[in-house]
């Protein structure tokens, strides 16, 4: 009998061991590192359209559409549906390590006069309650625990720009933009006794200023310079951080002041830091320097519309070629300080689906392969792996009806998501173009000695590739996609030259070597902004298991935890400014520096600075400069601006909302700069002002 028990135990242990070996590689994803998504694959879900796991919480009446016949109405998707698709392996087998879900807060219940509803989650009513049609707080907690136990982070959408549709002259329009604080009415649009909203009409998108301080369409626009609204929104996001969210996608960042949003990010990073990225929409071919400035200075990353629009032009619409794509890769690497933290995509809820029919499936597969091997944090829009089609909103938000794990796209995502976890070149690497013409793009990602080489042929004919060079070591390399896109094997010689080969029509091949560094290399730092005492995480390779040191320029920081690939430290007590980070191992080996971490001068508040009677000639603008890093440290080249003078105040009064250290004695002056860079300083003594310890403020002076 004992022999039989021993035999059964052996069989059982062998079976358990086999199951453990069979777990997908993505289970290695680190859900505790909430500030680094470089190796992750995000899956964007419009919660109402993904899966209806609990029909009992569906709405009734005019706002619900049975079988989703009316795409403007609720269709039943909920958090239970997402939980089910984690538990049945659909999302984990796909290789997903982060979910971006619709804003979870309570939305308006009323039907818009045009037949629209708040199914999308962007018409907030109460940020401290759940949308009951998605689920209650118990459901949300189960979603978080289920995701985390399966190696998946959860990102929430967040709309601090506006509440819901409203009209100045009609209090019965939808719900009058009303906003509540855990059930208590804060205010509404037509009876705005606390001045919570802007009342400047709708934006015509004619300028950056106009888009910030006027309503986006008919949405009631928050006055973020109002202390009540400022504190309510910051309390609200901290409420959800305490619920365990791992990331935030901020809606409509182009339509809020950078100053207020920087103060928001400071609040988040001082409370519970998580990876945060914003939506700054760019059209096809559009390049906006203000977009790059925001990504570099606000404290958050952005959805990379330059990447998304360009890959669509090359592979979907065929209006651009690989020269254009390579130019985008090259230019954005210079324009974004942390290009690997920008969030890339091929389609989303605000543009038509990439797939347009079965004849385009190959292009979808190819685009996904490029997305998942390029720099940035890749995002898959729900259903793209099933070749869901649809034009613009709402056709691009159809319910997902099939969960087929055998589609080519599903398999490609799964394989490359796994490779992102195991080869640091995809998460952290630089990009080098190796072979290029209108139809062919061969590019190499490199981090230390880890290399991924990807080749794409978007033409309808086979192409002979000669004179290709690579950093891959000598040897034969098989296609990591296992010929799912007709890839081939290559032979690399000792000098890096690749033997000539045929790159098949409409094919993608991926070749790689993973060779983790034994000397320290920093791959990512998150967040890249914080005040003294904040916790940041340094990710990379070769740090060693024994503690060394992390330097901000030459100043050591307090170590919280240390491993070979991840270090957590506290920002040292240094003056506000920009510092280069480096890791020094216990063996006294120093890493290359990671550039320009911004140390804030303290807790941040948003202050509106304004000046009256500042007349200028055409081509001359007004700026502000002062005695802290947030005001440029008296460097005219780093002055804040150009200031605004059209909406909240009109010329010759100028104004600008700026994030400054709280409770700080500030000195500052205004300067005039012309288009040639000539500067005229405001005369007299430095102006002085003490910023508030919390909330917001406005300080106006005369020129």
Curated annotation (Swiss-Prot):
Region annotated C, chain positions: 429-516
Disulfide bonds: 68-75
Cofactor descriptive note: Binds 2 calcium ions per subunit.
Identification of the protein by name: Cyclomaltodextrin glucanotransferase
Site (Transition state stabilizer): 350
Region entry B, spans: 161-224
Signal peptide: 1-29
